[in-house]
Amino acid sequence: GSATVTGTPKQLASVSKFVASDGELKLKLDPEKLSDVVRKGAPTLLKEGKDAKIEIVDHTTPKVVPSEDGVGFDEGKLAESAAEAATTGDRKVEIATKSVPAKFTTEDAEKMGVKEVVSSIETPLTNDAVRTTNLKVGTQKVANTLVKPDEEFSLLKALGPIDAAHGFVSSGVVANGFNSTALGGGLSQLSTNTFNLGYRAGFVDVEHKPHSKYFSRYPMGMESTLWEGKYDMRFKNNTPYGAVIDTWVADGKVYSKLWSTKYWDVETSTSKPYAQVAPTTKVNPARDCEPSGAGGPGFTVTVSRKVSRDGKIHENSSYKWTYSPTNRVVCK
């Protein structure tokens, strides 16, 4: 096909500048800006390539969805020809289209080595249906996310804005040590699951923060809260292979798997709770205060991880986390 694009004087002025060359002023057009003018003028003729994707079918089988080439043109040649034509009588330029490969091709996807489960976790849901809505929305947004070698995964970035316009609802959270509600309440369960995927696969723990209070549905110490603008959950893929996150809600649980090629041998362990602190009574002056009785004591745990390959230790680390007691809450 073909198309005619007519640039207005205002458009051409916005992409033009004069530069000194051999004692003369010569017209130079910005290739990128001029190309944008052409693309907007011929939207049906030109198209972006479509990147390949790696999807986990039925949570059992990795599948490469092939890339599609786009239709484009030589931007540099267009700018040169247009600058030359601007000084001639007819001011017309003919430019041939060409096939433009996607940024991430089918071949690129196949080289990622996504073939097996390298870590997994399942955690039980609460009986709060509203909270479960957030987890269903959240897992759908995160599922089939590809983390390339040396790439960092950010859960907040993968989820996008946590607001009502994007399907999230208000549910229970812990704010300043007290129970409250906020948009996206419950997403810390997804944060916990995805943290465990990266941690158990030997990936770099870039950022995670356990809860201030312990919830028995999560692995002690190996869990992660999430709060937009404050606490993210991030890990970095430190292997030569791509990794795809598969996560979903079913049968009263949040399931998560990390698909890749096994690279690291990983051993994790959590100490028994120590340094226990008995609960007390706390006064919550907040307007949305929820009174509650005392629960379990506070305590500290130490989480350790040894990451090795071919018998050589790559990392031998540990961290401590202290949980607050579940205090009796009185509203004032």
Regions found by a protein language model. Give the residues of each.
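Well-ordered beta-sheet/strand-loop patches within structured domains
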Residues: 1-332
